[in-house]
């Protein structure tokens, strides 16, 4: 697969720079950190902002959902790697003058570990930040073990619904409950028809035959239900 890349070690920063320039009417970099994208029109300080930290490589998730009625900020990590707890905490601190902050966390081990670390750092500074763990992928855990499911494309419903409501409501607990309701009523199932290619190494993320599809694969190539032949 052909890709237009300048230097591999700058790929994420170049991508973000291009995105911000292309959508400068809606988003901008945080003043001192080019891995934090924020909306141009700031939310009223009486309202609760929504923040997410996630690895790059899933675009337009989540940077494409930063804007009015959506997410207030996205802390971006390397490809398929969550930003560190310190980096996410840096994003949280941008909103410490608000009555509360919701940190959206997609249910993947690195995202959860680093997100919870950021919440702990916020607690130490008496910043009212609360996590909302998001999951929807039915291939990763059975009914009755929903909290073990991975986050997938269904998380975008939370971005939009909670983002719109957060422009109206000021109570963080009510917003958390709404986010949980959206999450608990969302299910997704992915189908992979070909492998992604690492822009760094040029290697395939997984192998799949031309006459196969993979049902239930995770967003990083994690295993799902299995392969199935197609005509």
Name these PLM-found stretches:
Residues 1-50, 207-210:
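N-terminal amphipathic/basic leader segments beginning at the initiator methionine
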Residues 44-53, 62-75, 139-142, 212-229:
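Gly-rich Lys/Arg/Thr-decorated short loops/hinges at beta-loop-alpha junctions or inter-strand turns
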Residues 48-55, 71-74, 100-109, 116-119, ...:
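Short glycine-rich or small-residue beta-strand-to-loop segments that form or flank ligand, phosphate
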Residues 58, 67-98, 231:
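Glycine-rich oxoanion-binding loops at beta->alpha junctions
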Residues 59-61, 85-89, 110-116, 140-142:
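Short glycine/serine/threonine-rich phosphate/pyrophosphate-binding segments
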Residues 65-73, 118-128, 149:
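A glycine- and small-aliphatic-rich helix-loop capping segment at beta-alpha/alpha-beta transitions
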Residues 74-79, 123-145:
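Short, acidic/small-residue loops that bind anionic groups at enzyme active sites
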Residues 140-150, 159-222:
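Internal, active-site/partner-interface "lid" segment
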């Amino acid at each position: 697969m052909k890709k237009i890349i300048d230097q591999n070690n700058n790929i994420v920063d170049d991508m973000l720079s291009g995105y911000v320039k292309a959508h400068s009417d809606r988003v901008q970099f945080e003043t001192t950190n080019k891995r934090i994208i924020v909306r141009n029109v700031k939310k009223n300080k009486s309202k609760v902002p929504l923040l997410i930290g996630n690895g790059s490589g899933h675009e337009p998730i989540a940077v494409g959902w930063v804007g009015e009625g959506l997410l207030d900020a996205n802390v971006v990590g390397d490809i398929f790697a969550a930003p560190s707890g310190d980096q996410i905490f840096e994003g949280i601190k941008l909103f410490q003058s608000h009555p509360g902050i919701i940190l959206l966390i997609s249910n993947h081990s690195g995202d959860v570990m680093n997100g919870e670390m950021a919440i702990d750092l916020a607690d130490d500074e008496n910043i009212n930040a609360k996590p909302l763990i998001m999951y929807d992928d039915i291939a990763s855990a059975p009914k009755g073990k929903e909290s073990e499911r991975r986050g997938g494309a269904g998380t975008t419903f939370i971005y939009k619904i909670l983002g719109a409501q957060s422009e109206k409501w000021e109570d963080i607990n009510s917003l958390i409950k709404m986010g949980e309701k959206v999450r608990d009523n969302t299910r997704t199932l992915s189908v992979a028809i070909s492998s992604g290619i690492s822009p760094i190494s040029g290697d395939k993320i997984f192998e799949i035959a031309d006459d196969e599809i993979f049902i239930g694969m995770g967003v990083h190539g994690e295993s799902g239900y299995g392969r199935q032949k197609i005509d």
